Each structure stands twice: as structure tokens, then as C-alpha cells.
């Protein structure tokens, strides 16, 4: 069992996103507990290429995409590895949840360890709109919070 965690960046949004994978062939469970976001909203989160936050969340680079795919929904065959989709917030702007993901890995060559988890200001359109950013970023907006994914105790 490998466990990893990413914590907030520099904004009012805080919380943790944890990753757990039993073995190299198992799906990864992604769990989140996020506070301080917009109330009653769907907000995007993705794993980005670099574990570099020297210039805030901007230096995390594009979505983690080792297979050269277009942006998509977590359940799509054609998607970036880092495409986690959206989470829903409650009336206070908090979100708690989990999902399993077959492409997110903590073990192997395409591991997300050392990369950055970014929480976006907008909703991921899942690559389904006509917006020029849709097939690249999901048109998910700014990056108000992020954290490097590191090995958890």
C-alpha cells in the first residue's frame, strides 16, 4: 500500500487530497476534504506535470499527460492522466468525497508522486465545449490552490 497527500497552496482554500494505491495494478483512491471554496459549486481539480510551486500554482505546468491525450472526463478513455474532473461544494464552500481512478498511479513510471495537485477556480467542462481551452484544460480557470503530492506517513 502506497499513500500520498497534497495540501493547500497560498489562498483561502485549504484542505487535503489523499491518494492510496494497494499495488501497481490496483486503481487509486482519491479522497478530498477541502474548505473555503465557492458555495454550492462544482470546481475542478487536476494533477499537473511539475512539483514546482516556486511561482505559485502557475509553475506546476500543464495537466500530467504522459500518453499525449486530449483533455476529458475521469471516465473517458481519451483523457489526461491528471484529469480528475470536478468536486461539489456545500453551502459553506466545503467539499468532502472520494473516487477511484484507474489512471492515477502512485507506483510505476507514470506515478503522480512529486507532481502538483491543483484546485481550480472554475468548473471543468470535461473537454466537451467549443471553448479553445476545452480540449487542453477543460476551461477550468485560475489556480487558487495547489500542493505537491508527497509520500504520506
Curated annotation (Swiss-Prot):
<dbReference type="InterPro" id="IPR036423">
    <property type="entry name" value="SOD-like_Cu/Zn_dom_sf"/>
</dbReference>
<keyword id="KW-0479">Metal-binding</keyword>
<feature type="binding site">
    <location>
        <position position="80"/>
    </location>
    <ligand>
        <name>Zn(2+)</name>
    </ligand>
</feature>
<keyword id="KW-0862">Zinc</keyword>
<feature type="binding site">
    <location>
        <position position="63"/>
    </location>
    <ligand>
        <name>Cu cation</name>
    </ligand>
</feature>
<keyword id="KW-0963">Cytoplasm</keyword>
<feature type="binding site">
    <location>
        <position position="83"/>
    </location>
    <ligand>
        <name>Zn(2+)</name>
    </ligand>
</feature>
<keyword id="KW-0560">Oxidoreductase</keyword>
<feature type="binding site">
    <location>
        <position position="120"/>
    </location>
    <ligand>
        <name>Cu cation</name>
    </ligand>
</feature>
<keyword id="KW-0186">Copper</keyword>
<dbReference type="InterPro" id="IPR001424">
    <property type="entry name" value="SOD_Cu_Zn_dom"/>
</dbReference>
<feature type="disulfide bond">
    <location>
        <begin position="57"/>
        <end position="146"/>
    </location>
</feature>
<dbReference type="GO" id="GO:0045454">
    <property type="term" value="P:cell redox homeostasis"/>
</dbReference>
<keyword id="KW-0049">Antioxidant</keyword>
<feature type="binding site">
    <location>
        <position position="71"/>
    </location>
    <ligand>
        <name>Zn(2+)</name>
    </ligand>
</feature>
<dbReference type="Pfam" id="PF00080">
    <property type="entry name" value="Sod_Cu"/>
</dbReference>
<feature type="binding site">
    <location>
        <position position="63"/>
    </location>
    <ligand>
        <name>Zn(2+)</name>
    </ligand>
</feature>
<dbReference type="GO" id="GO:0004784">
    <property type="term" value="F:superoxide dismutase activity"/>
</dbReference>
<dbReference type="GO" id="GO:0050821">
    <property type="term" value="P:protein stabilization"/>
</dbReference>
<dbReference type="GO" id="GO:0006882">
    <property type="term" value="P:intracellular zinc ion homeostasis"/>
</dbReference>
<feature type="region of interest" description="Disordered">
    <location>
        <begin position="124"/>
        <end position="143"/>
    </location>
</feature>
<dbReference type="GO" id="GO:0016670">
    <property type="term" value="F:oxidoreductase activity, acting on a sulfur group of donors, oxygen as acceptor"/>
</dbReference>
<dbReference type="InterPro" id="IPR024134">
    <property type="entry name" value="SOD_Cu/Zn_/chaperone"/>
</dbReference>
<dbReference type="GO" id="GO:1902693">
    <property type="term" value="C:superoxide dismutase complex"/>
</dbReference>
<keyword id="KW-1015">Disulfide bond</keyword>
<dbReference type="GO" id="GO:0006878">
    <property type="term" value="P:intracellular copper ion homeostasis"/>
</dbReference>
<dbReference type="InterPro" id="IPR018152">
    <property type="entry name" value="SOD_Cu/Zn_BS"/>
</dbReference>
<dbReference type="GO" id="GO:0031505">
    <property type="term" value="P:fungal-type cell wall organization"/>
</dbReference>
<protein>
    <recommendedName>
        <fullName>Superoxide dismutase [Cu-Zn]</fullName>
        <ecNumber>1.15.1.1</ecNumber>
    </recommendedName>
</protein>
<feature type="binding site">
    <location>
        <position position="46"/>
    </location>
    <ligand>
        <name>Cu cation</name>
    </ligand>
</feature>
<feature type="compositionally biased region" description="Basic and acidic residues">
    <location>
        <begin position="124"/>
        <end position="136"/>
    </location>
</feature>
<dbReference type="GO" id="GO:0005507">
    <property type="term" value="F:copper ion binding"/>
</dbReference>
<dbReference type="GO" id="GO:0005634">
    <property type="term" value="C:nucleus"/>
</dbReference>
<comment type="function">
    <text>Destroys radicals which are normally produced within the cells and which are toxic to biological systems.</text>
</comment>
<comment type="subunit">
    <text>Homodimer.</text>
</comment>
<feature type="binding site">
    <location>
        <position position="143"/>
    </location>
    <ligand>
        <name>substrate</name>
    </ligand>
</feature>
<dbReference type="GO" id="GO:1901856">
    <property type="term" value="P:negative regulation of cellular respiration"/>
</dbReference>
<dbReference type="GO" id="GO:0006825">
    <property type="term" value="P:copper ion transport"/>
</dbReference>
<comment type="similarity">
    <text>Belongs to the Cu-Zn superoxide dismutase family.</text>
</comment>
<dbReference type="GO" id="GO:0005758">
    <property type="term" value="C:mitochondrial intermembrane space"/>
</dbReference>
<feature type="compositionally biased region" description="Basic and acidic residues">
    <location>
        <begin position="68"/>
        <end position="80"/>
    </location>
</feature>
<dbReference type="GO" id="GO:0005829">
    <property type="term" value="C:cytosol"/>
</dbReference>
Amino acid at each position: 500500500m502506497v499513500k500520498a497527500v497534497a495540501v493547500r497552496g497560498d489562498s483561502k482554500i485549504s484542505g487535503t487530497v489523499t491518494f492510496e494505491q494497494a499495488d501497481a495494478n490496483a486503481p487509486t483512491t482519491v479522497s478530498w476534504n477541502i474548505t473555503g471554496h465557492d458555495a454550492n459549486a462544482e470546481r475542478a481539480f487536476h494533477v499537473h506535470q511539475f512539483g514546482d510551486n516556486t511561482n505559485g500554482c502557475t509553475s506546476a505546468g500543464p495537466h500530467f499527460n504522459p500518453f499525449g491525450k486530449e483533455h476529458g472526463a475521469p471516465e473517458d478513455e481519451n483523457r489526461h492522466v491528471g484529469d480528475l474532473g470536478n468536486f461539489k461544494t456545500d453551502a459553506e464552500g466545503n467539499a468532502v468525497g472520494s473516487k477511484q481512478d484507474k489512471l492515477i498511479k502512485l507506483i510505476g513510471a507514470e506515478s503522480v508522486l512529486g507532481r502538483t495537485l491543483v484546485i481550480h477556480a472554475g468548473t471543468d467542462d470535461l473537454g466537451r465545449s467549443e471553448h479553445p481551452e476545452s480540449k487542453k484544460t477543460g476551461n477550468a480557470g485560475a489556480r487558487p490552490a495547489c500542493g505537491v503530492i508527497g509520500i504520506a506517513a
